[in-house]
């Protein structure tokens, strides 16, 4: 229902306009206060790169963060990552992730990023505290990447990158809750890079596609082409589950059942195992896998995806960030 409201297909969005105007007024006032220096943002002693979006829901930010961290690491840059830690609840903040940190403590995305990149990752509702925690334990970190947080103006940033869903883009264009917008589309004029996940990019936007890898067994880590799996039940607890189901079909998989779950939904063995019957195979997103690995069964697999950015702009962006991190 919410997708129909935000896309404009349902007329119910008009009933929510008063709340949207209030949201826009408050969020605009907050940004203006920081712009006029009526409120002061905390500036880290190292460069900060924000990877965020203008809309609620999944746009592909986390794969971009992983891509960015890995690309900078390949260039010899030591990167730290901070996040709000949505969906997690730690005993205290900031929380610096370790191999024992669970998604219940830190949230799905931070654990995924930590496992994929081995970079220092910290979470806190106050992102500046997360940055301080990383730099205290890892003083060699040269640059901070923040997963989400475009609207978290308490943390000063040197580079802003916005990720857009190229198919849904901005829906009906209204602020939350009548539409999907956290900020209006005009905000794109002030950011450093706009990355478009799928769809048809517009002038100045960097095209990106999510490339699926081989399916990975949660229990033993073996890999195979996902098309080789039979009697598949697909599960996705991400911001936009239909994207994952479409990816499976693109890979030649016709799921017997597709199960969309809420983003950041907590999972347990009983609920997940109930999704599949004898002889069926469960295929989930990598984001779901970080929550299920501890209690996985032999017929549970996940499909990792990697961001692939096209054109000349990604190389220019990486050169800019490498120069910033190196102090040049």
From Swiss-Prot:
EC number: 2.7.1.130
Function description: Transfers the gamma-phosphate of ATP to the 4'-position of a tetraacyldisaccharide 1-phosphate intermediate (termed DS-1-P) to form tetraacyldisaccharide 1,4'-bis-phosphate (lipid IVA).
Catalytic activity: a lipid A disaccharide + ATP = a lipid IVA + ADP + H(+)
Single biological process term from Gene Ontology: lipid A biosynthetic process
Organism whose genome encodes this protein: Shigella flexneri serotype 5b (strain 8401)
InterPro entries from the UniProt entry: LpxK (IPR003758), P-loop_NTPase (IPR027417)
Sites where the protein binds ATP: 55-62
Classification via SUPFAM superfamilies: P-loop containing nucleoside triphosphate hydrolases
Gene: lpxK
Pathway membership, UniProt: Glycolipid biosynthesis; lipid IV(A) biosynthesis; lipid IV(A) from (3R)-3-hydroxytetradecanoyl-[acyl-carrier-protein] and UDP-N-acetyl-alpha-D-glucosamine: step 6/6
Family assignment from sequence similarity: Belongs to the LpxK family.
GO MF: ATP binding; tetraacyldisaccharide 4'-kinase activity
First-tier enzyme category under EC: transferase
The protein's name in its UniProt record: Tetraacyldisaccharide 4'-kinase
GO cellular component, one term: plasma membrane
A family per Pfam: LpxK
